[in-house]
């Protein structure tokens, strides 16, 4: 049977309701017991007075942390309680009496908690992160749908690398080599030639032997590709999407942000349009800060942090040197040394959150780039077909969901941004 959700208790003040959930915590003053119950939508305190319900009072003494229960009671307004309401308990049913719970309310080490990630997710903090992640995903879907983009799923098993990297998870696909996708981008370009504007959500995999706070082996990308979009159109789309997401989270998940201790003013300070720095300007900025950095090098995490510290909003770095970007990036017609690619760097030191750019639409140039990058042309014949049959200017990007969640929630590590993180040397549970 369904009960009333805790988040809806405000609609039932002075009414008797039934809620279902798990015992998060309890305390007693001898004659009164306080049962803190969670149901995934919030927490509520149930109050049990011994003299008013002695049998229920005794039954409640048996309850252990995370026991599944059904509570019946009268909803009362109580500003001092979590959520502003509490329940005067009139009935209690134990659905399942939990065994001794391994995660207590004291501090635990990260490895201990990661080994019990399937249980750690039940805490209010982890609940809040998961809800914010879900809100970000829903906001992105709403944004794309409002802008006439079509959801087109891309494959996870692919015959070739998207960018020719060595960080691939290789598979034996019925005797042939195949790989777990690092990006749906090449397929997204094909989809854009079919539907005009497309987006997709999907897991991506990179076998990077990295243990930084920004890296996972398996992570989710929100990707988009649009025919007839040039470089500037692409950056405008990105900033509007990120702004839309931030505003949606502020509107609908403020309480979760507050639970996490997030400085909400940092998110409220974000304005459109986002600042733009050319790669060359970013290099000069780093040098002015005393960094030994040469034109042609790629930015590392410390460099991105230094750059981001100069801006309240995310900042675009655009027109990177050709040598450090992917083979499909379109050269800048005004400067052949650089490509029409841009990264969006998150504020507060969270690094690159979006990578994107305008794609090469000329067949001969794309064939030349494949050769320069020593990529097998035969594996990309289908991709070259896109330039043979009705090629048009087109652009796209990919947003790293976990890094975006980490920034919006201001988390120390991306491992908390995904239900079951896959990191170097960790694939359990």
Swiss-Prot record:
Stored Pfam families: tRNA-synt_2, tRNA_anti-codon
Quaternary context: Homodimer.
Keywords annotated in UniProt: Aminoacyl-tRNA synthetase, ATP-binding, Cytoplasm, Ligase, Nucleotide-binding, Protein biosynthesis
Compartments, as annotated in UniProt: Cytoplasm
Protein name, UniProt field: Asparagine--tRNA ligase
InterPro entries, A to Z: Aa-tRNA-synt_II (IPR004364), aa-tRNA-synth_II (IPR006195), aa-tRNA-synth_II/BPL/LPL (IPR045864), Asn-tRNA-ligase (IPR004522), Asp/Asn-tRNA-synth_IIb (IPR002312), NA-bd_OB-fold (IPR012340), NA-bd_OB_tRNA (IPR004365)
GO biological process, one term: asparaginyl-tRNA aminoacylation
Family per similarity comment: Belongs to the class-II aminoacyl-tRNA synthetase family.
Keyword Nucleotide-binding attached: yes
EC annotation from Swiss-Prot or TrEMBL: 6.1.1.22
Enzymatic reactions: tRNA(Asn) + L-asparagine + ATP = L-asparaginyl-tRNA(Asn) + AMP + diphosphate + H(+)
One annotated GO molecular function: ATP binding
Top-level enzyme category: ligase
Major location (coarse): cytoplasm
CDD domains referenced in this protein's UniProt entry, alphabetically: AsnRS_cyto_like_N, AsxRS_core
PANTHER family registered for this protein in UniProt: ASPARAGINE--TRNA LIGASE, MITOCHONDRIAL-RELATED (PTHR22594:SF34), ASPARTYL/LYSYL-TRNA SYNTHETASE (PTHR22594)
Gene assigned in the entry: asnS
GO cellular component: cytoplasm
Transmembrane domains' residue ranges: none
């Amino acid at each position: 049977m369904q009960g009333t959700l805790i988040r809806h208790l405000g609609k039932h003040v002075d009414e008797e309701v039934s809620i279902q959930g798990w015992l998060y915590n309890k305390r007693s003053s001898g004659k009164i017991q306080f049962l803190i119950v969670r149901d995934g939508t919030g927490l509520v305190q149930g109050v049990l007075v011994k003299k008013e319900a002695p049998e229920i009072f005794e039954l409640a003494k048996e309850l252990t942390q995370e026991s599944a229960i059904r509570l019946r009671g009268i909803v009362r307004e109580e500003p001092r309680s979590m959520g502003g309401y509490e329940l005067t308990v009139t009935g209690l049913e134990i659905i399942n009496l939990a065994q001794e719970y391994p995660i207590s309310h004291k501090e635990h080490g990260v490895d201990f908690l990661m080994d019990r990630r399937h249980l750690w997710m039940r805490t209010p903090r982890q609940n809040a992160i998961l809800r914010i992640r879900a809100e970000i995903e829903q906001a992105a879907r709403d944004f794309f749908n409002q802008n006439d983009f079509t959801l087109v799923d891309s494959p996870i098993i692919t015959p070739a690398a998207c960018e020719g990297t060595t960080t691939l998870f290789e598979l034996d696909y019925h005797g042939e080599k195949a790989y777990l996708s690092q990006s749906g981008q090449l397929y997204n370009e094909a989809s854009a030639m079919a539907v005009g504007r497309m987006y997709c959500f999907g897991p991506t995999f990179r076998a990077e032997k990295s243990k930084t706070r920004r890296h996972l082996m398996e992570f989710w990308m929100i990707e988009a590709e649009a025919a007839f979009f040039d470089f500037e159109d692409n950056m405008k789309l990105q900033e509007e999407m990120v702004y839309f997401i931030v505003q949606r989270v502020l509107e609908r998940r403020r309480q979760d942000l507050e639970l996490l201790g997030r400085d909400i003013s940092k998110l409220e300070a974000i304005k459109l349009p986002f600042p733009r720095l050319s790669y060359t300007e970013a290099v000069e900025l780093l040098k002015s800060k005393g960094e030994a950095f040469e034109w042609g090098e790629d930015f590392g995490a410390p460099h991105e942090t230094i750059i981001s510290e100069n801006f309240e909003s995310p900042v675009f770095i655009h027109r990177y040197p050709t040598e450090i970007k992917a083979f499909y990036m379109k050269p800048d017609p005004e400067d052949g040394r650089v490509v029409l690619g841009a990264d969006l760097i998150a504020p507060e030191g969270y690094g690159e959150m979006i990578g994107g750019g305008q794609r090469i639409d000329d067949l001969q140039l794309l064939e030349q780039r494949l050769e320069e990058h020593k990529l097998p042309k035969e594996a990309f014949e289908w991709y070259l077909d896109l330039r043979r049959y009705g090629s048009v200017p087109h652009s796209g990007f990919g947003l790293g969901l976990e890094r975006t969640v980490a920034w919006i929630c201001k988390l120390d590590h991306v491992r908390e941004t995904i239900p079951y993180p896959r990191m170097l040397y960790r694939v359990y549970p």
